[in-house]
Amino acid sequence: MCIVYIGDKYGIATTDVTTGDFFVTEVDSERKLLDELNRFSPTEIICNEPFYMSGVDIDDMKERMGIAVSALDSWYFGDDLAKETLLSHFHVQSLEGLGLMDYDCGVIASAALLKYLYETQKNTLSNILELRPYSIGKYMIIDSSSRRNLELVETMREKQKRGSLLWVLDKTKTAMGARLLRSYVEQPLIDKTEILKRQELITNLNDQEITREELREYLGPIYDLERLITRITYQTANPRDMIAFCNSLEMLPPIKTLLEDLKGELATGIREHFDCLEDLCALLKSSINDDPPISVRDGNIIKTGYNEEVDRLRNASTDGKKWLADLEGKEREKTGIKNLRIKYNKVFGYYLEVTNSFKDQVPDYYVRKQTLTNAERYITPELKELEDTILGSQDRLVELEYDLFRQIRDTIADNVARIQATARAVAQIDVFVSLALVAGRNNYCKPKINESGVIDIKGGRHPVVEKMIVNDMFIDNDTYLDNHNNRISIITGPNMAGKSTYMRQSALIVLMAQIGSFVPAESANIGIVDRIFTRVGASDDLASGQSTFMVEMNEVANILRNATANSLLILDEIGRGTSTFDGLSIAWAVVEYISNPKLLGAKTLFATHYHELTELEGKLNSVNNYCIAVKEKGDDIVFLRKIVKGGADKSYGIQVAKLAGIPELVINRAKDIVNQLSANDITETVKNISVEGQASGKKKKPHLDEVDLTQMSLFDTVKDDDIIQELRDVDISHMTPMDALNKLYELQNKVKNRW
């Protein structure tokens, strides 16, 4: 990846030299830049010197993200050189032909990246044939925290594919399809038309199950065409690579035939770019042996009948064995030496070997070459001439086969554009066959897509969890959010009851719908969202010196600053990393902020153990309470995993602790303590707090929607006027230190007793 920072803009060029993919875009903020880094996960970044002064945390890139970052000399980033480099490489007359009219920084980044690759790869980069500009507004934005929390492509703990969304969806048969599907998962669409095109093709494949299964059968033997053609163009492909390539090409005609059965705009587009490459397949089948060696210098690469000279030299090599056998028989008969043998080694070539018992019968025209303990080795003029013929033909044959192989490889490389287009078409059909298969096997439904902001999921299921559980049944749940009276759902209930799973499943269903996939639900009507944010769990970031609470607050700050009214927020246990009062205050204020359409107004699922937040239902029109249903059996509980309307009145923390195996002595003591604390419950106080920041009987402040977010304390439960007056009356100048200490102790006790 190359990043160029010029005039508050970042030009970003990204390539994968193994496949020839080359992308370019521009962004105008550090946050958007980080989103692109998360999208592509580059291993190396080159940049201009001003990038180091742009405010981006480059040390974080190197240490946390594991990216090698280095600045290039300024001459790499000249305007004239950039234009010249791109026009020359892509063989066009103007940048307009590349679609780069609006990408000034992107042009410089792309050209600098090409120049860098010329120098480091030491080749012409002939597999990079297309530069694809894209707008970040074309895709849903998912930041690194949300990608991690939703476990899109790997699990949070084990960093494994199994247990991720990609693991569920990926039933692709080719490496190209697997890469493309991953990019779909990481880059959901926000264009309704494009989403519906994908849905149409998946529906078509579901309706034609026989066609779908036949496509899978023919896709299976196809090797990684994108990387094979890269090796071919870089002249590193060996004979076995060419056979793998040929075997892959043989699968293309039946796939093309099956594609004729599919309807729709996307299917038509795939067919148009699908070249069966029959001429290349015929060339390889006629020229390369079916089981060639790995090395191009080992010979036996070219098929008999492809080249007359190869056939002649190969016959000479084959006939040479007969010639040697005839010579051996003739010399035995002439000399009477019955155990005479013609042998070969790399030092002496061919020679006649005679044991010591017959050496007296050796004729004068035998020339001794080597004496052994039990034998003598000789050559003759006739054997030497025969050796020159045989070995010379073998050397010439190996060299000729190598030259012919290179010519064939170059012919294939000249067709790189056709091959890459077909490889992309194969990858696309592989992805949609996989998504159709998963939809059918897992009983997914085709979601409706709307632009009105309504998210209505009936019988939704978590796509990963339902595949991981073995001896239990996954309980489905409904979700309803819109841009009006159902903007925020506050979800309460005990730990382990399923709040986090429910919220994640809702986010994943929305994301899957915008991929174009079917979704795990009875029915779904999904309003397109521009971003998904998740704040689920937190841990210390010791490397940067941040506590759990600071990590949490950083994530919340990022969400509140970057979310829009069209975003979906998944917020779990906001404020739990600090004291109860501070945490509740922050959570309350966050809900108020999100609910205000003039400030944010995003659709939100908000899980909390602060039951006091349920008082916001009725105070804020857009807030609704939901909880996880629990069945009590004495001191025990059963999690029903069902989301129901209303707020939970208990956290069941002690019961969960009991399930976890906490000693009974601790459980009993906890029950005693909770009973004492319940007497000082603040819930009744919270009921009297208005979202306008006023308590009963006090002067009304301006409404939140009208002015600002200024709030009174949620916990105005202690009347301290008498203590304040007593402090005013204290005559400090006439008190001894001991008197002052006693007075302080007395006032402190009064305050403690009131709490």
Task: Label every PLM stretch briefly.
Residues Y103, K173-T174, Y184, T355-L383, ...:
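ATPase nucleotide-binding head domains, primarily ABC-like/P-loop NTPase cores
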Residues F23, H91-D102, E151-T155, L165-L169, ...:
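Short hinge/gating elements
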Residues R182, R314, K384-E387, L391-V398, ...:
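Short amphipathic alpha-helical segments with heptad-repeat character
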Residues S713-W755:
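C-terminal tails and terminal domains of large nucleic-acid-associated
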Residues F77-T85, V92, I141, N247-K322, ...:
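Amphipathic heptad-repeat alpha-helical coiled-coil/stalk segments that mediate oligomerization
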Residues Y234, N238, S248-M251, T304-G305, ...:
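Charged, surface-exposed helical/loop "interaction arms" that form contiguous linear patches used
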Residues M1-N204, G220-T233, A237-G329, Q694-D705, ...:
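Charged catalytic and DNA/RNA-contacting regions of genome-maintenance
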